[in-house]
């Protein structure tokens, strides 16, 4: 006889416990496997120095949840996000303010995503800034550290020349842009 076995395979836990478990484990990936120099999210646990721009945005949001839920302190979260922002600002190659899909987390150099994708990636940059803008809103205390972080995020956000990435002056943005192709 064929059919679906609908017996429980795992222990049932209350919804709140499940939410906590998912949030904690998601956060742990970004926290534990963040690049030691840049703080950015690695593409995979086995990717060495390759970090991902969009994944870093997801990681920043996970850090905000972790601070709010008490998995880490607010200070730990602000320090890691500032580390990422400083790396983006001082070390990374930016293309009219936008970043590549993949970056070398030790040097800031663009790591080509494919043969002709060796420049800006607006989708990944957008995902990164979703996290950073959420951090800018979350870290709203009137302290020197949080004020500096907000100012740095704002400066990077405003440095993106979205208009430059318009396709032939139309109301369409390029997804990828390469300095070579």
Where are each of the predicted segments found?
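Extended ligand-binding clefts on enzyme/binding-domain cores
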Residues: 8-9, 16-17, 97-126, 141-181
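Well-ordered alpha-helical scaffold segments within catalytic/enzyme domains
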Residues: 6-16, 58-72, 87, 127-142
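A structural signal for well-ordered alpha-helical segments within the folded catalytic domains
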Residues: 24, 28, 54-57, 61, ...
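Membrane helical hairpin/interfacial module
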Residues: 49-57, 61-119
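Alpha-helical membrane-embedded segments
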Residues: 1-2
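Long, well-ordered core segments of solenoidal/helical folds
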Residues: 22-38, 80-96, 148-171
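Low-complexity, Ser/Thr/Pro/Gly-enriched N-terminal "stalk/linker" regions
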Residues: 6-51, 95-98
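Surface-exposed patches in mature extracellular/periplasmic domains of secreted proteins
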Residues: 38-43, 72-77, 142-149
């Amino acid at each position: 006889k064929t059919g679906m076995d609908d017996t429980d395979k795992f222990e049932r836990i209350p919804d709140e416990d499940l939410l906590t478990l998912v949030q904690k484990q998601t956060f742990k990936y970004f926290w534990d496997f963040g690049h030691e120099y840049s703080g950015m999210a690695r593409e995979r646990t086995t990717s060495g120095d390759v970090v991902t721009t969009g994944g870093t945005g997801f990681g920043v949001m996970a850090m905000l949840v972790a601070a709010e839920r008490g998995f880490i302190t607010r200070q730990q979260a602000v320090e890691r996000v500032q580390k990422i922002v400083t790396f983006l600002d001082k070390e990374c190659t930016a293309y009219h303010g936008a970043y590549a899909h993949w970056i070398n987390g030790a040097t800031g150099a663009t790591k080509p995503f494919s043969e002709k994708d060796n420049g800006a990636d607006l989708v990944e940059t957008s995902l990164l800034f979703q996290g950073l803008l959420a951090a800018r809103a979350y870290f709203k205390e009137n302290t020197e550290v949080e004020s500096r972080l907000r100012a740095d995020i704002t400066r990077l956000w405003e440095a993106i020349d979205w208009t430059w990435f318009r396709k032939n002056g139309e109301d369409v943005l390029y997804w990828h842009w390469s300095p070579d192709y």
